[in-house]
Amino acid sequence: MIEQLFPEVTCYALRYLDYSSLCQLSMTSSSMRKTANDDVLWRALYFQEFTEETNGGTPVNGWKAFFAVTKQVMTVNDKFFSILDSRSLPRMTSLWLNSDYVKCFNGSGELFTGYLLTYPLL
């Protein structure tokens, strides 16, 4: 039924969905996948969820990928600061013992990975 609406109306209605609901809706049919993957929709969701400014351009891989990367980075940062705030020695020990692998994302959403030891030994 919603597929029979004009694409602009459907896209406007979908702006009220959150991240997980939008992802679930995109798996219901091919027309919903096309509508739910609209770049304008993901741009609006990005600015609704995050108040950070971008560099003013369009992300290389689109707003959906940029949203997913930003959400993942925010989740990891929240977990990190939660562990530090808890001042729990076991949680901090686990963090430091398992933190040798690093993932970084630049502004365009490009992923860089590597191990913490990226400089020559002295």
Swiss-Prot record:
Domain F-box residue range list: 1-45
Query: Which Pfam family, an example, fits this chain?
Result: F-box-like
Any idea what this protein is called? Probable F-box protein At4g23960
Please give the organism.
Answer: Arabidopsis thaliana
User: What taxonomic classification does the UniProt entry list for its organism?
Assistant: Eukaryota, Viridiplantae, Streptophyta, Embryophyta, Tracheophyta
